[in-house]
């Protein structure tokens, strides 16, 4: 195989190595699924550090095909005769063939496909590539299922597949049911390659709903948050119930334990971000002092979502669904699978409410006095929805997150510190959002 992966790979939006100096991409594993379809595992080498593995499904044709989008065309291969390689996920026939392999629990070479017990896959549904994914590629099959193909693959048990399977088999109603998956083995380590879940048709993302609510609030200058037509508090209560339900199922199915507060982990992040972001440095000592209050405290931990925010929840006609259980982006797999306090997820949601309210102020600009008035309304919206979320969580679990104020504040600070590092690097204009939150939590 002689495709120009070196040129094509760095242009893909799901490619995760942009912060590193690219060296080469080599097709080390090629599994022929059928005559015109190969599953390719690339080893990507960098000037420094460890290599990474990426998965590409290649559809072959004798000549270029006009109906493929430009992003799908990888290039020409002259090693096995003149032929053109495409990203196969953009070919409906190839995507459908992958679904049939999962449906039959086939094994092709070292690639193992598996259908979950007592499920039906939509083999007659028409596939289309979703435009929503960033780090993976998803193919939607009509209104019935979504096939998520992992691009950067890592060794070990994939938490998205693992936790979806646990929750689905336990009958939890707040996840999209897992229908199937496929994986391989490299150097005696399992590598998850993809998964199929039920598709949440006619759903709305929590982030979009929250933004609509804040837009309505800011547009109605003489109304309070509970008087605006787009009030989100009722949904926040139901969302709190859903998160608590998922936590309860994970705790019941996978167990709980008592461990010390992860002081070393949060201090390491704090040091790293403070070194990189001057705006955080004056407050690093105060944040550390808040963390150290919990140094001798044992906390209850179990498996959690790990990266929960309003963009990871979908509102369907039946209720809220939690999606994407992969954990915090960029963290090693063992960290993403490590049990943590449920306050980690609660803190992620509370931070997301602040972003939903305050990012509109960042984007709109305006005169200082008007912005001050809108900031007060944003704070009102955040407080109302945080309260409703915690009320819902308490109603479903019997545990009110606000009863663990110091622990919750520590996890909120840790999340905000992470956000400071992210915003300083990628969206400097948004840096005031987490910085102001840190000052609020510290009481400055």
From Swiss-Prot:
The catalysed reaction is: D-maltose + ATP = alpha-maltose 1-phosphate + ADP + H(+)
Pathway given in the UniProt record: Glycan biosynthesis; glycogen biosynthesis
Q: Which family does it belong to?
A: Belongs to the aminoglycoside phosphotransferase family.
Could you tell me what this protein is called?
A: Maltokinase
One record GO biological process: trehalose biosynthetic process
Pfam families referenced in this protein's UniProt entry, alphabetically: APH, Mak_N_cap
Query: Subunit structure, per the record?
Result: Monomer.
Q: What class of enzyme is it?
A: transferase
Molecular-function GO terms, alphabetical: ATP binding; kinase activity
Provide the alphabetized UniProt keywords: ATP-binding, Carbohydrate metabolism, Glycogen biosynthesis, Glycogen metabolism, Kinase, Nucleotide-binding, Transferase
Concerning Gene3D superfamilies, the annotation shows: 3.90.1200.10
E.C. number(s) listed in UniProt: 2.7.1.175
What is the protein's known function? Catalyzes the ATP-dependent phosphorylation of maltose to maltose 1-phosphate. Is involved in a branched alpha-glucan biosynthetic pathway from trehalose, together with TreS, GlgE and GlgB.
